[in-house]
């Protein structure tokens, strides 16, 4: 499933917004969540700047299709969606270099390797 919850942190913790993308279609057995044939995998790696939240989005029944990146504002509104030419394992963003996103990608041929994406 894919759910994003945003929280306001002050004297206590309050949910400021919740976005539902894919309902969690899973079975619960022996204290574990188990995927079904209907399970759509949602978000993987997350990173944030003061302005935006970035996430690897799977959006597929195959959990190995992590080649989409979404950006959201802090109210949970989707700003952009990017299709990558590689499988993105983890993300890193910078407040000073706002037009570039850095990532660790993975492939059978290269193993883990560094990539960057121009967001302009």
Task: Go through each PLM region and give its residues.
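Loop/turn-rich, solvent-exposed surfaces of beta-rich toroidal or solenoidal domains
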Residues: 35-72
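Short loop/turn segments immediately following beta-strands, especially the blade-tip
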Residues: 7-19, 79, 117-120
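Surface-exposed loop and turn segments in beta-propeller and other repeat-based domains
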Residues: 10-38, 86, 95
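Beta-propeller blade signature
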Residues: 65-78, 114-120
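Recurrent small/Gly-Pro-centered beta-turn motifs in extracellular repeat architectures
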Residues: 1, 56-59, 103-107
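Structural signal for beta-propeller blades
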Residues: 2-5, 69, 110-114
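Blade-level signature of beta-propeller repeat domains, shared across WD40, Kelch, NHL, RCC1
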Residues: 91-120
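Conserved beta-propeller blade repeats
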Residues: 41-46, 87-96
């Amino acid at each position: 499933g894919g759910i994003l919850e945003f929280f306001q942190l002050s004297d206590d913790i309050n949910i400021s917004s919740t976005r539902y993308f894919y309902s969690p279609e899973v079975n619960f057995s022996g204290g574990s969540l188990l995927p079904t044939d209907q399970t759509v995998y949602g978000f993987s790696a997350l990173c944030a700047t003061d302005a935006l939240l970035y996430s690897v989005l799977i959006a597929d029944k195959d959990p190995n299709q992590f080649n989409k990146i979404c950006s959201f504002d802090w109210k949970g509104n989707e700003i952009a969606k990017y299709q990558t030419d590689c499988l993105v394992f983890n993300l890193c963003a910078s407040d000073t270099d706002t037009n570039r996103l850095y990532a660790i990608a993975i492939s059978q041929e290269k193993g883990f390797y560094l990539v960057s994406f121009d967001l302009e």
